[in-house]
Amino acid sequence: MRIIAGEFRGRVLKAPKGSNTRPTTDRVREALFSALASARGGFDGAIVLDAFAGSGALSFEALSRGAATAHLFERDRAALAALEGNVRALGLSANVARVHRRDVLKNPPISARPPFDLVFLDPPYAFDAADVLGMVAQLAAAGALANDALVVYEHAAPSGDSVDSAAAELGFALASRKKYGDTVVDILRRA
């Protein structure tokens, strides 16, 4: 797994050992970041929340392309070890790549200031969409989500209906949906 573009282009990232995580493939990341760059007009200065960071590939790609700060949340020990190793390998300071060892669903970063511009949600597929998007709704209600923020939600293809209903119920609108095999990547906005 490698960083596709920007300052860290070509740098290899380590993924956690085992089957608890499934890193987003290079192909999917490349398509996603092209769509995000078009929707956002680039990444310069973005404040990123990576709620289920795993290896951190999504945040590191955003940082490589000009994001200012990434808050990476992870609770799995093996994933945390890989994540922290990737931060060190890229030479990122703790002010740029802020790693948080905690369950973001139980303890969301509602006091974050400045608010998040870009949110990555790549939870285990078994997680309920209402719980995952409910956490983002809590951020919005607390002022920790920018009004024009983009929320990227990667999920299993069969769960599209539950994501749609949870998004609508919680005040988010689908901006785009792309399917890559068994994986779907949605880009959501506040409605």
Residues of each region from the PLM?
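Class I S-adenosyl-L-methionine-dependent methyltransferase catalytic core
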Residues: 1-191
